[in-house]
């Protein structure tokens, strides 16, 4: 079940990828008896973010929910209590955007898994690309150092074409200033480490294939500025 609590502008996303026609086409109809049994007799409530970090998509949120990922980006408040953080949506803090930003990728992933239920050959369904980088994913770096981000080991098991996107996950790290990334949409990108000693910078490789549906995988690079 993909059940999420949507409010305000998020309903626009639901109209496209979470309404009954989408579920009928991509999940319930023609995808075997298990998918056909998916009920639509209630309002999606929001337990899904608790489960989504268990899907190994490269964001490593299963190791620490506060890293942010398909399960949103919860923060500890008042001891052990957790609540949604605020990710920036068009420059404005929005606690709902911590999960909303991932919805298209989540829904496509679900649709692909439904296709697996009825594909009698591996080649008749799409599968997630594999995001890999050269070097360590957690590094200690110095201010002013040039860092090469190389995703050339990445591949797609279906031989689909891949698109690369590097971006700074500002809310997950403690470096809040925007860091310039050169060659942001290429396999090999680079940055200059900002002058923020004692801070942590999170960079995400977002890898997208051109299969049907488009599927994404990720690789998180954490730079600890010394």
Summary of predicted features, one role per range:
Residues 1-13:
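Single conserved hydrophobic/aromatic residue that forms the stacking wall/gate
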Residues 122-137, 162:
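Proline-centered linker/hinge motifs at extracellular inter-domain junctions
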Residues 131-138, 168-194:
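Low-complexity "stalk/linker" and mucin-like segments enriched in Ser/Thr/Pro/Ala/Gly
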Residues 139-145:
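Short, solvent-exposed loop/linker segments at the N-terminal edge
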Residues 150-158, 167-169:
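Acidic, Ser/Thr
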Residues 199-203:
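Exposed beta-strand face motif in extracellular beta-rich ectodomains
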Residues 208-214:
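Short, solvent-exposed loop/turn segments at the edges of extracellular beta-sandwich modules
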Residues 214-221:
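Extracellular and select intracellular beta-sandwich modules with Ser/Thr-enriched
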């Amino acid at each position: 079940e993909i059940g999420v609590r949507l409010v305000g502008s998020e309903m626009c996303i639901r109209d496209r990828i979470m309404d009954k026609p989408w579920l009928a086409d991509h999940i319930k109809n023609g995808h075997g008896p298990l998918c056909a049994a998916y009920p639509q007799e209630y309002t999606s409530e929001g337990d899904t973010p608790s489960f989504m970090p268990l899907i190994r998509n490269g964001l490593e949120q299963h190791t620490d929910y506060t890293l942010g990922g398909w399960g949103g980006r919860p923060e500890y408040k008042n001891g052990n209590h957790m609540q949604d953080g605020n990710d920036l949506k068009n420059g404005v803090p929005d606690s709902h955007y911590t999960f909303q930003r991932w919805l298209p990728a989540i829904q496509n992933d679900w649709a692909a898994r439904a296709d697996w239920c009825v594909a009698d050959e591996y080649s008749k369904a799409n599968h997630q690309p594999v995001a890999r980088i050269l070097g360590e994913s957690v590094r200690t770096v110095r201010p002013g150092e040039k860092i090469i981000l190389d995703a050339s080991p990445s591949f797609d098991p279906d031989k689909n074409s891949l698109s690369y996107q590097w971006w700074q996950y500002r809310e997950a790290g403690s470096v809040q200033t925007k860091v310039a990334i050169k060659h942001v949409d290429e396999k090999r990108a680079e940055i200059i480490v900002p002058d923020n000693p004692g801070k942590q910078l999170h960079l995400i490789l977002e890898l997208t294939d051109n299969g049907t549906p488009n599927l994404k995988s990720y690789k998180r690079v954490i730079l600890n500025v010394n």
